[in-house]
Design a protein with these regions (language model features):
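Intrinsically disordered, low-complexity regulatory regions in eukaryotic proteins
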Residues: 3-204
Length: 204
């Protein structure tokens, strides 16, 4: 599941260093209602945890981004290089899971009136970690390709080899066309990020 749809329930059966486990008080004495159904408890039980299971594909992570943009706007072509003095200071961007083999890479540009225009690039990978790039945003077209390379960036930040994604793509925003070459150096997988959710009980 890509969202908070499935959980692993864990119930506490014993304790050490505490007086007791807070098992709650049902509205009806002697009743044993479902723990997650708050309507049947006068004091909610605190003796369980719901661990959510959520799928993240291999490319889901935060990356350090650098590259070159060739921008065509109103017939004028300019080139913009994005590259900090050190990799650690490059732009931080995120790639998230869309499906088993597809990841979402959000990019943006500025329109002629100064507003920000966003586009979700869809990176669809094959078994060789090569990807095709398309647009997931209505009204904006994109084409391109790329590749994920394990330890592709040698002696990168922290003096260690780092995984990387190399992308080359063209995006047509309508008012502006951008041809981009990107290098995305893995920063963190983000698997230790705390996410909380509020479960809702639904009777069958």
């Amino acid at each position: 599941a890509l969202g908070c749809n499935y959980v692993i329930p864990v119930v506490m059966k014993g304790q050490t260093g505490a007086d007791r486990i807070l098992t709650g008080t049902p509205l009806i004495e002697g009743d044993k209602p479902v723990r997650t159904n708050s309507d049947y408890w006068s004091v909610l039980p605190k003796d369980y945890v719901l661990y959510c299971v959520k799928y993240m594909n291999p490319w889901h992570a935060s990356y350090l981004r650098r590259g070159i943009d060739k921008i065509t706007e109103n017939g004028t072509v300019t080139t913009s290089e994005r590259h900090a003095q050190s990799v650690e200071k490059d732009e931080v961007c995120g790639i998230t899971t869309r499906s088993l083999n597809t990841a979402v890479f959000p990019i943006s540009t500025t329109s002629t009136n100064g507003t920000t225009v966003n586009c979700d690039l869809l990176l669809t990978f094959n078994d060789d970690n090569e990807c095709t790039i398309t647009s997931g945003t209505t009204g904006i077209s994109a084409t391109g390709s790329g590749k994920f390379v394990e330890d592709g960036e040698k002696n990168s930040w922290g003096n260690k080899d780092r995984d990387a994604i190399y992308l080359e793509y063209d995006v047509d925003f309508g008012f502006k066309q951008i041809a981009t070459k990107d290098t995305l150096v893995l920063q963190t997988r983000g698997t230790n990020k705390l996410e909380v959710f509020a479960p809702k009980y639904k009777a069958n």
